Amino acid sequence: MEVSSENVALFDMDGTLCDYHGKLLMDLKKLARRGEPEITSFRNLPDYARERADAIRASIEWWANLPRLRLGWDILEVAQGLGYRIMILTQGPRKNAAAWTGKKLWIDENLGEDIDVTITRDKGLVYGKTLVDDWPEYMDRWLRWRRNGLGVMPVNAENAGYTHPQVTRYDGTNLAEVREALEQRLVLARSLEDARRKGSQLGYRVR
């Protein structure tokens, strides 16, 4: 399938291509004291657990050595096979320079030094036809201005129950559904490009 260079698929890192949640939960468990409740979610962490998590994430090596997450790589391989232009879109913590450095090292090691990377505080500002991201707030922000955008979301405990008419959730069993959604987004992109081309010839603009 011939694909325009503008058919960009944006891929998140933490919880999408990297097993951020699994690794952090495992490392927090190692630091847990007897009698403390088990931590299973990162929402509403108690102060002591948040401080430990911050200490863990202060290491460049921690970010650089995060394990791959199979769900995200399944989607990546499908998008690559369809001819999407792959770009990494990840959030950069305000006060953690180690994360910025470690993420770039991870990208270089796992995806190569030539892949396009955007590290931002606001994913909603970044262009793409598709966003692959596990975090509902980031997905909603990106889709807010993109009535034709496609979201693909690797399923985890943090996004349980999330739904959106433009988002396909992937749990490891429905890769064919993900492929179809990605293919249909390319079909839509091509039809919109054709309409814009015809519109410009007739002197009006197609949105």
Feature roles, as predicted:
Residues P67, G72-G102, I107:
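Substrate-recognition element of Asp-dependent hydrolases with the DxDx(T/V) motif
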Residues T118-R144:
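Conserved Lys-Pro-Asp/Glu-containing loop-to-beta segment of HAD-superfamily phosphomonoesterases
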Residues N7, D14, I115, G128-K129:
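Conserved acidic residues
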Residues M1-I56:
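Active-site neighborhood of HAD-like aspartate-dependent phosphohydrolases
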Residues R85-M87, T130, L150-V152:
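A structural signal for isolated positions on well-ordered beta-strands in alpha/beta enzyme cores
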Residues D134-N174:
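Acidic, Mg2+-coordinating phosphoryl-transfer loop and its flanking beta/alpha structural elements
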Residues V187-R207:
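C-terminal accessory extensions appended to soluble enzyme cores
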Residues K103-T118, H164-L192:
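Structural recognition of alpha->loop->beta junctions
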